[in-house]
Regions:
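Glycine-rich phosphate-binding loops of nucleotide-dependent enzymes
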Residues: 1-240
Length: 240
């Protein structure tokens, strides 16, 4: 199993093309630490990562990005937005990192990319030059989402993407996730709201005390089953 330096127990994990799965569990159960290990944001100390059957090495986020993995972090204020930069510069940031800072996008390219995602995600902003800090929380979150979609990932990890945003934007993000999956993208979705997870995910990995204690899919995807697995999850350990 995969293990990082963030104190999570070794865990096995897979995701299929076009699938939306999720990590669920109480706050502090280790959900974020699992995806941070996959993205290289925390150091992996044991286990292997494979893509299409071949082992890949991810020591840092840039390695993950080069493998087509994108990660929208839990705290957009700390790890996501760069407040003083414009909406445009925030959108192109990850793609520019992948492209290399010695090969900057032209002004025309930058505007084209920004306008494309402002339109696609219906980001409410006066212009692409507006500082991102002046946007609402929901629109800031859409900008970060646009930033990662611009890298054209094969696998998108969303950690609490709808926390602290209005209901309308929440529904838009959920619909977008399902649309991306239908187009072949693999998505891991983490939310503290179990009803949101049940609406969005076709498979749930249940965690307790920094350990995977069960996996639910199909008819098992109910609030009751999630809570039962969190409460008495050890008995599902042997089913892996």
């Amino acid at each position: 199993g995969l293990q990082s330096n963030a104190g999570i127990k070794p865990f096995d994990f897979y995701i299929k093309k076009g699938e939306v799965n999720g990590f669920t569990g109480l706050l502090g159960s280790g959900r974020s630490e699992c995806v941070r290990a996959i993205f290289g944001a925390d150091r992996v100390i044991a286990g292997k990562l494979k893509k299409n059957g071949k082992e890949i090495r991810i020591h840092k986020p840039l390695d993950a990005m080069k493998q087509g993995i994108a990660y929208l972090p839990e705290d957009r204020k700390v790890d996501g937005i760069i407040g003083d930069l414009s909406v445009r510069d925030n959108i192109i940031l990850a793609a520019q990192v992948l492209n290399g800072f010695f090969k900057p996008f032209s002004k025309a390219q930058a505007y084209k990319f920004a306008d494309e995602y402002i339109k696609l995600l219906e980001i409410k902003t006066a212009s692409a030059d507006t500082p991102i800090k002046s946007l609402s929380g929901g629109n800031q979150q859409k900008v970060i989402l646009g930033r990662w979609l611009l890298t054209h990932p094969e696998y998108l990890i969303l950690d609490e993407p709808t926390r602290g945003i209005d209901v309308g934007t929440k529904i838009e993000i959920q619909k977008l996730v399902l649309k991306l999956a239908s187009e072949g993208m693999s998505v891991t979705f983490i939310s503290s709201e179990t009803d949101e997870m049940l609406r969005t995910c076709s498979r749930l990995i249940v965690m307790r005390d920094r350990k995977v204690v069960g996996e639910l899919n199909g008819d098992e995807l109910t609030q009751v089953m999630i809570m039962n697995t969190i409460a008495g999850g050890d008995e599902k350990d042997g089913e892996k």
